[in-house]
Amino acid sequence: MTTSLPPQYEPTVTEAKWQTAWEESHAFKADPDRPGEPYCVVIPPPNVTGSLHMGHAFESSLIDTLVRYHRMRGDNTLWLPGTDHASIAVQTILERQLKAEGKTRDDLGREKFLERAWQWKAESGSTIVNQLRRLGVSVDWTRERFTMDEGLSQAVKTAFIKLYEEGLIYRGNYLVNWCPASQSAVSDLEVENQEVDGHLWYFRYPLTDGSGELVVATTRPETMLGDTGVAVNPHDERYAAMVGKTITLPLVNREIPIVADELVDPEFGTGCVKVTPAHDPNDFVMGQRHNLPFINLLNKDGSLNENGGDFAGQDRFEARKNVVQALEAQGFLVKIEPYRHSVPYGDRGKVPVEPLLSTQWFVKIESLAQNALACLDEDNSPNFVPERWGKVYRDWLVKLKDWCISRQLWWGHQIPAWYVISETNGAITDHTPFIVAYDEAEALAKAKAEYGPTVQLQQDPDVLDTWFSSGLWPFSTMGWPEQTDDLAKYYPTSTLVTGFDIIFFWVARMTMMAGHFTGQIPFKDVYIHGLVRDENGKKMSKSANNGIDPLLLINKYGTDALRYTLIREVAGAGQDISLQYDRQKDESESVEASRNFANKLWNAARFVMMNLDGQTPQQLGLAPGEDLELADRWILSRLNQVIQQTREQIEDYGLGEAAKGLYEFIWGDFCDWYIELAKPRLWNKEGGDVGTQRQLVARQVLAHTLDSIIKLLHPFMPHITEELWQTLHQAEGQFLALQAYPTVNQSLVDPALETQFALLIETLRTIRNLRAEAGIKPGAMVTVILQSENDQERQTLQLGETYIRDIGKVENLQVVSQLPPEQTQAIAGVVDTIQVLIPLSGLVDLDILRNKIQKTLDKVTKEYESIEKRLSNPGFVNKAPEEVIAGAKESLNAAAVQRQMLQERLKMLG
């Protein structure tokens, strides 16, 4: 094993090496018999059709950080991977392929179509999984699941049959979201409401008795052919006398009643609404309440059926135009107004969906939701992070309606119900009896027992909503309904990490299904992350065409850089993040900054390892307290504070804060200061036994601190830290990923010392800045006078004299309580109450320095006067926003301070 690092970090090579090594060695394979508290996460299964987008990268980075931390903490950890069969998405792809070949799925038939679907899955379905591998996710690939694999299919059948036998699944005729493009019912999640510019058409509906008319307004004129009533609000006095009368429906000449219903908004349109119970959710409710007929107008493809009369066979939008023209020709059109309103679109078919009366399978939700609510109210289970999402989840559970679970597709879990078609002359109707069973043999046996030996069966052609199998995901993936070792050890799972957009559709369904079948909520915590927004603050999405390909950034900057950026950008749990990206150059400043951080760590580690004389941290050990110098005790105290802080922040899901804290400690405290402070000891210029001992202690502290840093950072940047740890420890056959996470050594924590050392660092920083401002050559030795009336401050400065001399290139250091009188030809600065002076005689050309400072002073004075003039202008002060005025005052104060400092510098130069 090599004991040195290459001069440059090459992320592509390193990442591929460790991803392969981890997977081939089964480093992340879970064992339920292993000791340790269980920590389990099931992956939110991406669609098998998917490819990696920034949302996946963000979510996976968050999960992997948590999982790697808990594994290193000593927990018995399982991150279970898998993919979702994505019924509509796969079917859409396959039907698009068939269309290009001039075929339809009906031309192939169900069996051949499914063969083709499985073939497509085998050839193309692993894209998203392989891309997740590029992220370095520490999942147990031996447990990878697919929502249509044999075990999960058995779980789906079991769940369906149990719910049916308990009376919680039924077949009924209700309104569903119907997508004419896929010719299937779709879930609410698959519907996206879009604001569109449309029209509001006003039509006359004449009273049958000839005594007048009502004017109704609608955004969908074609549905008037299915009207079976007109409704008004019972408190609307304008129409009180008309309730109970009838109107004659134009074009159809159907007599329909006028009813009073609280659902009617008197302010919408004229306060009269047409009622089409088969094609509108509110109208459906009113139709049931007033016993109105339900007339279905639509075919599955969105064209009008025979109930459309003269418009039968026309597409719904073509029929809309023609119905309006016919009503206008007959004098029933009153007016047309522009109207912006919300239209539901199917997210796959990209066409408006229709509320359609259809016979479907439903799950009764009320009792399932009540159980989930009881867990939330009594035990705060699950615990939402951030807490506010618990209220959103609760509100949704209260408002739940029965869940339509059938889809008119072929790819998916076919509903385990067989119709006894011999009882209805070979046809499937609303009255055909059916048998629910695990397979056809069981169904046939049941049917023969009930209907005789000559029965004929036909399985329901529909498949289950994808969310039905996804709702079983946390426990079906572990072997349910069998009582497996995995289920006993890892269920309920520990944390679910997901976006807020599917709390309603996935999280709630999992809690309801799991609570019903296992008696336990499926996860202890639900960490809701925010959205990934683009450089303009807009949500990244396909429709907005503003997404960034994570693989492009991975190839350019490395996986660790992208992961670290995504996590570091999180201001707090649940907050959105914004990713800076130059689309013309394909560059990201924020990801580049993380790559620079990786390079900084690499270079620091390389320097440390080159100065350890080939020894590992174990071989070196850590010096006892009495041998530690001031800087050693400071960095070890800071290290242990950071260990405690990082552990607490990760435990509380403050991953962004943890990432930022590590960045500041590693780059600032360790790289910029401690390594620099340790260099003179490493180079052992003083020699002798004392010098050699000081060198050894510096090596020990450097090795210990670097080792701890690598471990602390591993969950966030796993690849570079694995490479560094392997080299530092000269390890063979071991992985950093399986080592213990650092724990706090309270005996090394010294807050008072940290405060002292912070003063030293600020003093050194000021000396460096003054040298640079004065133009003193880097190697030139200087005199520094440090003045403070505070005894404790002077004592601290004297304790740090060695560091001030070494880092500040100080030949003559004076720590005094009072400055000598008439200090001239010097440059000065201030640290708290400490005055810092560097005499300049013989070091720089004072005339050049005076001219430089005078130019800066002139510029600052001009800026000061400009701001002052603006603030004295009543027109600006009276009209400008408060924040603009406050900003101007702040700039004025800053300019005043800088001007005074420059004036004092000129005065001191003489």
From Swiss-Prot:
Family: Belongs to the class-I aminoacyl-tRNA synthetase family. ValS type 1 subfamily.
GO CC annotation, single: cytosol
Name of the molecule in the record: Valine--tRNA ligase
Domain note: ValRS has two distinct active sites: one for aminoacylation and one for editing. The misactivated threonine is translocated from the active site to the editing site. The C-terminal coiled-coil domain is crucial for aminoacylation activity.
UniProt xrefs under Gene3D superfamilies: HUPs, Isoleucyl-tRNA Synthetase, Domain 1, Valyl-tRNA synthetase, C-terminal domain, Valyl/Leucyl/Isoleucyl-tRNA synthetase, editing domain
Keyword Transmembrane included in the entry's annotation: no
GO annotation terms (biological process): isoleucyl-tRNA aminoacylation; valyl-tRNA aminoacylation
InterPro entries for the chain: aa-tRNA-synth_I_CS, aa-tRNA-synth_Ia, Anticodon_Ia_Val, M/V/L/I-tRNA-synth_anticd-bd, Rossmann-like_a/b/a_fold, tRNA-bd_arm, tRNAsynth_Ia_anticodon-bd, Val-tRNA_synth_C_sf
Its EC number(s): 6.1.1.9
Alphabetically ordered keywords of this record: Aminoacyl-tRNA synthetase, ATP-binding, Coiled coil, Cytoplasm, Ligase, Nucleotide-binding, Protein biosynthesis
Keyword Protease among record annotations: no
Organism: Synechocystis sp. (strain ATCC 27184 / PCC 6803 / Kazusa)
